[in-house]
Amino acid sequence: MEANNTNIIELKQVDFQYQGDAAFTLNNVSFKIPKNQWTSIVGHNGSGKSTIAKLIVGIEIATNGTIIFNQSPISNNDFKDIREHVGIVFQNPENQFVGSIVKYDVAFGLENHAVPTEKMKEIVAQSISDVGMTDYADSEPHSLSGGQKQRVAIAGVLALSPSVIILDEATSMLDPQAKKSLMSLIQEVKATKDVTIISITHDLTEALEGDHVIVMNQGTVYKEGNPQTIFKDIKMLQEIGLDLPFSMKINQLLGFDDHFITYEGLVEKL
């Protein structure tokens, strides 16, 4: 779908401090998430990136500052409505499963919304098909591979037709092939659905998939821009403890001039 350049989410001067902690986890964080685009929020462990996801959906409440959703500032009372529009896929999908088999798990959110049975069956079948898991609709989620489990988690989110999908380290437990397959699926979802993707990750290879990158370091926005801009600053990425994508490491070893390069681009160059 053609990208809409308006912003679906905005954080303005947001601070956050966990109860009992002396230090703030987030300090004066401000950024915008463009609608219908893929924004990657990257940083090492402890940079505050996952806390941002919790603030967006109201799992935690900002200590100071404003969070805006669809042009409207949100209060503590609004988060139930926000959760109607935002779906999250976590690092370990096991923690999200509630159904005994795949199709029941995908149906869970729809049941909570009192969707009529026949309509529910239609939505569940389509959502499972969208993630390529039709053959596993009657399987137990816990019997699936890591990549398959994440596909089921995504199907459960898609069934509710969210405006935003947040992937919170969703690929960190997957092998390289499963990770690549899941990223292809997310690209397909972005291309065919009216949805904004927010990927929270320490994996810069995953961040290459996005349209926009926000770099977090020690609870602040360190830098942001498109992937080409961010990944040209190799020194900055290394200084804050982020591991360069494999394609860029090889590019460096071979002495090529361009710093930003995808795996496909490196193959073409070789």
From Swiss-Prot:
Organism expressing this protein natively = Staphylococcus haemolyticus (strain JCSC1435)
Q: How does it sit in the membrane?
A: Peripheral membrane protein
Where ATP binds, per the record, is at 43-50
Gene designation per UniProt: ecfA1
Q: What does this protein do?
A: ATP-binding (A) component of a common energy-coupling factor (ECF) ABC-transporter complex. Unlike classic ABC transporters this ECF transporter provides the energy necessary to transport a number of different substrates.
User: EC number(s) on record?
Assistant: 7.-.-.-
What residue stretch is flagged as signal peptide?
A: none
Keywords, alphabetical: ATP-binding, Cell membrane, Membrane, Nucleotide-binding, Translocase, Transport
InterPro entries, alphabetically?
A: AAA+_ATPase (IPR003593), ABC_transporter-like_ATP-bd (IPR003439), ABC_transporter-like_CS (IPR017871), ABC_transpr_CbiO/EcfA_su (IPR015856), ECF_ABC_transporter_ATP-bd (IPR050095), EcfA_1 (IPR030947), P-loop_NTPase (IPR027417)
The record's listing under CDD domains reads: ABC_cobalt_CbiO_domain1
Q: Coiled coil located at which positions?
A: none
Query: What protein family is recorded?
Result: Belongs to the ABC transporter superfamily. Energy-coupling factor EcfA family.
Q: What class of enzyme is it?
A: translocase
Its cellular-component GO annotations read: ATP-binding cassette (ABC) transporter complex
- Outline the subunit composition: Forms a stable energy-coupling factor (ECF) transporter complex composed of 2 membrane-embedded substrate-binding proteins (S component), 2 ATP-binding proteins (A component) and 2 transmembrane proteins (T component).
Q: Ranges for the ABC transporter domain?
A: 9-243
PANTHER family for this protein? ENERGY-COUPLING FACTOR TRANSPORTER ATP-BINDING PROTEIN ECFA1 (PTHR43553:SF24), HEAVY METAL TRANSPORTER (PTHR43553)
- Please report any disulfide bonds recorded for this protein chain, giving both cysteine positions: none
Q: Which GO terms describe its molecular function?
A: ATP binding; ATP hydrolysis activity; ATPase-coupled transmembrane transporter activity
Q: What is this protein called?
A: Energy-coupling factor transporter ATP-binding protein EcfA1
Q: Which domain of life is it from?
A: Bacteria
- Location within or outside the cell: Cell membrane
